């Protein structure tokens, strides 16, 4: 059985934090705020695809400034990865802290009622991917941005929260759509859980983190992966807590599954069509 890994993925953190921040806004409106997490993972999972099936350390931190007049916020974020084995290091990606992904972002919540229980949370960001060992930098000349331009939306409400993340990847002129539903549940004042189901769809040119990037596999795009996940958070103090996460991920695109069977039996991207993934770590906010 695969090792379990529990981690707080940055994309899920951003979606869920919108609801937490809404509660803060009901009480007070701070000028500066932020959050972060750091954990150990059973592997490097992205969009329901496993890029490395051996343990990694990954973390994310961001700081934000609320704009005057209640017009949302702007901020900076930084995600990092450290492979704990030589599986990907041998490919020239370096040792500890072999990936750094900074972002700049802006966000706003459009509330539909005075009690701030129903609303549409919006966030847009530009994400750069940087690998220090390769001095890696891919720039799109028309925009001077690297790789991803993301737009995220979540329909906040007391029941079931649908969300979508739209990713524009400039290097290959490709698009990806991440969408699902989640249900935050407060068990006690300290303990909360959040089950969710998530799908990923992409056009035929968005392949870099999927098995179809290898071997010239023909693909028409469409639904790519499915993820069913349970996140658990235990708040120890006002600003510090612990998290655990476990997920079942499955590649549902038949082109990808065929590529795993045909040519990728020994490659990280292809040997795990269906897998369990998870992690544990710490969370903080300020």
Q: What are the language-model segments listed below?
A:
Residues 2, 21-30, 64, 103, ...:
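Intrinsically disordered, low-complexity regions of eukaryotic proteins
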Residues 42, 65-70, 82, 110-113, ...:
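Outer-membrane beta-barrel transmembrane domain signature
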Residues 32, 97, 119, 223-225, ...:
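A broad structural signal for short, well-ordered beta-strand segments within beta-sheet-rich domains
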Residues 29, 71-72, 117-119, 190-192:
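Short helix-terminating capping/connector loops at secondary-structure junctions
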Residues 51, 78-180, 264-270:
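Outer-membrane pore/translocation modules
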